[in-house]
């Protein structure tokens, strides 16, 4: 879709800043990757994390040591509108944030 909404992780971060206690089981946490991997019964070499978030999807895949594909038409799309080299754009995003991953593959959309 065209609209981008805050993720549950964003809401948890805000809640924690207000003094609330959180326990996140989701990307980029290793628990969710372990859960999915244990259900799959395949080697890590056959797993590909597809996502639009350098912070959650790609970083999580990097931590779990699986390949990843970044879809640039998602939450970071405003950065990828330019005709710059995608890796240069990712470096610029990395300079502004912690916990960002490096994708193995990049494409605009899944078709």
Description of each model-found segment:
Residues 1-111:
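Asp-based, Mg2+/Mn2+-dependent phosphohydrolase catalytic module
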């Amino acid at each position: 879709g065209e609209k981008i909404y805050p993720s549950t992780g964003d809401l948890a971060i805000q809640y924690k800043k207000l003094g609330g206690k959180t326990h996140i089981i989701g990307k980029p946490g290793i628990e969710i990757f372990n859960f999915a991997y244990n259900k799959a019964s395949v080697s890590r070499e056959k797993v590909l994390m597809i996502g639009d978030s350098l912070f959650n999807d790609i970083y999580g895949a990097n931590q779990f040591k699986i390949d990843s594909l970044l879809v640039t038409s998602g939450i970071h799309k405003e950065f990828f509108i330019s005709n710059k080299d995608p890796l240069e754009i990712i470096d610029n995003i990395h300079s502004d944030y912690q916990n960002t991953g490096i994708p193995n593959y990049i494409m605009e959309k899944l078709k």
